[in-house]
Amino acid sequence: MEEVTAVGQPAEYLESLLDYLACPLDNSVPLSVARNAAGKVVALRSGDAEYQVVHNVPCLVPRLEEGARGALPRWQAHQKKMWQEYKDGDEGVFAAEGNDIGRRVGEIIARSAEGLYLDVGCGALARPVYMAASSGRVEWIGVDPFFGDTVRQFPFAQGLGEYLPFLPEVFDGALYAGTIYHHLDPRRSLRRAHSVLKPMGKLFVWCTARRLGRKYLIWRGLRALGFARMYNEDHQWAFTRKSLRTQLERAGFAVEDQVFLCEACPDLASCDHKNEYLTIAHRM
């Protein structure tokens, strides 16, 4: 998917992942481990499929199924754009240390949850600000299609949200930090997230809520007619507060709260900034 650099992760991070990893195409199937003569993990296997382990990072991106191939070039172009922006020093799409809303998200998670959490679309930062803000209460594992060139400070697997490569009922919680609308198929990703969470496991979705205006309605109508097109140059999908809630409920989650994250405005009606929300739910 990208040129892999010499940067990976410590061997102990990989070893900590092995008990949780599964076939991305069928996550009820655990992966078998292939080691070299020195005992180093070099590949993970499921049936006839073999997935590389590169510099202690399991590379678990499957071949996309036929139905997803039409959107693949657009998806690849978007991923390449974000990756290049990061390499050029623009961390705008990532929750870096100076991201106040990201820090608030981490604090909310720390107050309401604990245990082992999955960051779905963790990006390429060594440690996103919400991870730092929730440390002590939450232990993080990250998954992202980007291999990256940064040594992450948490266990990491290269993978897709639609094909989360983890066994069922492993995680106490999961977070989509501004990533749900980047997926080719967010519905599929949410269903897989439901699978990897323990019963009553927490789900946090941080995203920009769209207003029910002309642009959104036109885009939604085109989607309904079968025209696969992005909402804008950065987002494959768009959600209002209500439509996101509907998608979560259809995936088997019960929504507990939707927290308005703008620190400058008292409510959505008076806000002219990005309308960012943190939706809090749990697996039913």
Placement of each model-derived feature along the sequence:
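Acceptor-substrate binding/catalytic loop of class I
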Residues: 226-243
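Class I SAM-dependent methyltransferase SAM/SAH-binding core
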Residues: 116-163
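A short acidic, Gly/Pro-enriched loop at the edge of an enzyme's catalytic core
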Residues: 162-174
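Conserved class I S-adenosyl-L-methionine
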Residues: 55, 61-112, 130, 147, 203-227
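A short glycine-rich, Lys/Arg-flanked "PGG" loop and its adjoining helix->strand segment in the class I
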Residues: 187-199
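A short SAM/SAH-binding and catalytic strip from SAM-dependent methyltransferases
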Residues: 173-185
